[in-house]
Amino acid sequence: MWVFGYGSLIWKVDFPYQDKLVGYITNYSRRFWQGSTDHRGVPGKPGRVVTLVEDPGGSVWGVAYKLPVGKEEEVKTYLDFREKGGYRTTTVIFYPKDSTTKPFSVLLYIGTCDNPNYLGPAPLEDIAEQIFNAAGPSGRNTEYLFELADSIRKLVPEDADEHLFSLEKLVKERLEGK
């Protein structure tokens, strides 16, 4: 069983895995539209974390992890708990960056618009302000944003995720007092 990470699963890998591959999925875009009251925010003052939205022609880069043989259910149970804040699972096709590896199916956690923590679209300035001010049991929301942006930049320098990098720029400007 393979699991696709496109948010904190890229940079906060606190579960065992047998193998990992960088690659992408299609027909989605990554957006900071999911609220977090259990990791990067608190009830009444949620942080914002990424989910995926359907986007014909879109693509999202990330990392696929092969769960250890014999421990798939144990690790999946842990990931179900970690991703509990409104995420459901579906299966999609993963395209490895290394084109010598054929595409294959991966499990995907996605926060849909009908879950109670879904915040939806907002002006980038408003999302940046919310990320700048939010913190929760797992730390500041800014850490989540910066770790994700740094990871994508290192893993896939050619990925110009405009939503992600625009938010990073806006939040850094706030930190610098601009």
UniProtKB/Swiss-Prot annotation:
Keyword Cytoplasm in record: yes
Keywords: Cytoplasm, Lyase
InterPro entries referenced in this protein's UniProt entry, alphabetically: ChaC, GGCT-like, GGCT-like_sf
Superkingdom of origin organism: Eukaryota
Active site: E83 (proton acceptor)
Record localization: Cytoplasm, Cytosol
SUPFAM superfamilies with a match to the protein in the record: Gamma-glutamyl cyclotransferase-like (SSF110857)
Catalytic activity entry: glutathione = L-cysteinylglycine + 5-oxo-L-proline
Residue sites binding substrate per the record: V3, F4, G5, Y6, G7, S8
A single GO cellular-component term on record: cytosol
EC number: 4.3.2.7
CDD domains: GGCT_like
Family: Belongs to the gamma-glutamylcyclotransferase family. ChaC subfamily.
General function of this protein: Catalyzes the cleavage of glutathione into 5-oxo-L-proline and a Cys-Gly dipeptide. Acts specifically on glutathione, but not on other gamma-glutamyl peptides.
Assembly and interaction partners: Monomer.
Listed name of the protein: Putative glutathione-specific gamma-glutamylcyclotransferase 2
